[in-house]
A protein has these predicted regions:
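Immediate post-signal peptide segment of exported/extracytoplasmic ligand-binding proteins
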Residues: 1-10, 99-109, 272, 277-280
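Tryptophan-rich aromatic "cage" segments
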Residues: 268-295
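Short helix-initiation/N-cap motifs at beta->coil->alpha
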Residues: 36-48, 100, 138-171, 258, ...
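Secondary-structure end/capping motifs
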Residues: 218, 223-277
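Short, glycine-/small- and polar/acidic-enriched structural segments
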Residues: 10-133, 143
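Pocket-lining segment of extracytoplasmic ligand-binding domains
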Residues: 155-243
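Secondary-structure boundary elements
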Residues: 98-103, 129-137, 168-174, 226
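Internal, conserved structured core segments that host functional sites
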Residues: 111-132, 142-155, 161-162, 167-180
Length: 295
């Protein structure tokens, strides 16, 4: 059996249940060393990854990755989502200011950190397709630009002044609602814009049979082309690490075909919301090496 020198890769990866055994040393490799040199909060490294190629491997938000692929950035994904969740609960409003149904945000201002944020794309898609919201009639107020510099936000997207706090503006009524995800205030006045979001998410899952992907693992395209054995080894490590994680009902599966429907939906909603210049195919998200992983 041929032996290969150990390859060290600059890696940006957070501590997820599926990656923790890689991070804490329970899963190792004689072929590849992952140098976890990214920021403590991994998403703070996404801009550097797609703009400056700051890392060789690691996680990217799925919408950031789809954009990166659409604009020819040198990364390719493994069919290994490292996180996923239902998104119905991720948009809220202050119910003390009056009732608000999903359609009521038309003609109003809604806050989101960036227009192309993965949570924002999933939530807007749910609002459009499940509740009939015309997204073009909403003014989206943002704090930051996209991770990918090529994206031009649509005309109904306006930047807030520096230092603005979405949660505070939602609570005061300056914003009708805000997409905040895990940063939603733990305040009894906050109510989900989607009624009974847990039940809505369960009904959606029973119908669609997919869990929205949040972050995926990617590697440099050059690595996949020149050293496919290293990429296969990384996938093996992720699979082994995932085996240490407790069972979860909100974890996307591994493998291209198992994720095809979810990836297609992410592409479709990205295109509908004008965060990518064209509708990619699912197969364009992979190369020959990564498409075969888990097959």
């Amino acid at each position: 059996m041929a032996s290969f020198p150990v390859v060290t890769l600059k890696t940006n990866l957070a501590d997820y249940p599926v990656t923790l055994a890689m991070k804490d040393g329970r899963v190792t490799s004689s072929l590849v060393k992952l140098d976890y040199c990214g920021p403590k909060v991994a998403n703070k490294g996404f801009k550097d990854m797609v703009r400056q190629n700051a890392y060789d491997a690691g996680e990217l938000a799925i919408i950031t990755y789809i954009q990166a692929r659409a604009w020819g950035k040198p990364f390719v994904m493994l069919p290994a989502p490292v996180s996923g969740r239902f998104q119905h609960h991720c948009i809220g409003f202050n119910h003390e200011l009056g009732p608000l149904a999903p359609k009521d945000i038309e003609g109003r201002e809604v806050g989101v950190r960036t227009y192309s944020q993965t949570t924002g794309v999933w939530v807007r898609g749910i609002l459009q397709h499940e509740y009939g919201v015309n997204l073009d009639k909403v003014t989206w107020r943002t704090l930051e630009d996209a991770h990918v510099t090529e994206l031009q936000d649509p005309p109904n997207c306006k930047r807030l002044p520096a230092g603005s706090k979405l949660a505070d503006m939602m609570m005061s009524g300056e914003l009708a609602a805000a997409i905040l995800g895990g940063d939603m205030p733990k305040d009894p006045r906050v109510q989900s814009l989607v009624p009974d979001p847990a039940a809505a998410a369960q009904a959606w899952y029973e119908r669609e049979q997919l869990i929205p992907i949040n972050h995926v693992f990617v590697v440099r395209q050059e690595l996949s082309k020149q050293q496919p054995e290293v990429v296969r080894e990384i996938y093996r490590m992720i699979v082994e690490s995932r085996g240490f994680a407790p069972e979860s009902t909100t974890r996307p599966p591994f493998g291209l075909e198992a994720n095809r429907k979810g990836l297609q939906l992410a592409i479709d909603w990205s295109f509908e919301q004008k965060v990518i210049p064209r509708r990619l195919s699912v197969d364009e998200l992979f190369d020959d090496t990564t498409a075969a992983l888990g097959a």
